[in-house]
């Protein structure tokens, strides 16, 4: 929340979700922070404020463990991991948007082996829970 653009990465081979923080200089240098090293086959990341606390959290999709995960920004160097689902068969992508116009961010994912686009509705609590619904199950 310092106004500088930072970079997120998903590394499939070493299972790492990493944040590269921009120092804000005109010729920036970057500080790397591993968010997790256990996102088995990480394929996609997305940044959004998932719990409406004013800071940016991270979502990931991991295809080798079929997982969509949320990493809550606690304001320090540590991130709290929560599994949204572990049944997104070969999870390929993740995105966040307010799908139902209720003021909180919901999660959208796509998974290849089950051809599914799924929506996980945020209940809006400060420690949100998610209700899954399929948008499509034949998204080849």
Spans of model-derived segments:
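Short coil/loop residues immediately preceding or within conserved phosphate-binding loops
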Residues: 14, 42, 65, 91, ...
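Intrinsically disordered, low-complexity linker/propeptide segments enriched in Ser/Thr/Gly/Pro
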Residues: 1-9, 53, 130-140
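Calcium-coordinating acidic loop motifs
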Residues: 1-4, 23-25, 48-55, 63, ...
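Blade-edge motifs of beta-propeller repeat domains
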Residues: 21-40, 72-89, 121-140
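Beta-propeller blade termini
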Residues: 43-50, 83, 92-99
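A generic beta-sheet turn/junction motif
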Residues: 12-13, 51, 63, 100, ...
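Hydrophobic beta-strand segments that make up the repeating blades of beta-propeller
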Residues: 5-11, 58-62, 107-111
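A short loop-to-beta-strand structural motif that recurs across blades of beta-propeller domains
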Residues: 16-20, 67-71, 116-120
């Amino acid at each position: 929340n310092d106004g500088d653009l930072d970079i997120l990465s998903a590394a499939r081979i070493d299972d790492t979700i990493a944040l590269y923080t921009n120092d804000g200089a005109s010729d920036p240098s970057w500080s790397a922070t591993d968010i997790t090293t256990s996102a088995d086959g990480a394929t996609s990341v997305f940044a959004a404020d998932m719990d409406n606390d004013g800071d940016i959290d991270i979502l990931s999709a991991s295809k080798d463990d079929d997982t969509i995960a949320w990493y809550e920004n606690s304001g320090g160097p540590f991130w709290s991991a929560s599994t949204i689902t572990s049944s997104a068969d070969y999870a390929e992508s993740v995105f966040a948007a307010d799908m139902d116009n209720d003021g909180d961010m919901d999660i959208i994912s796509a998974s290849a082996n089950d051809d599914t686009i799924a929506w996980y509705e945020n209940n809006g609590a400060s420690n949100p829970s998610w209700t899954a619904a399929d948008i499509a199950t034949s998204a080849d």
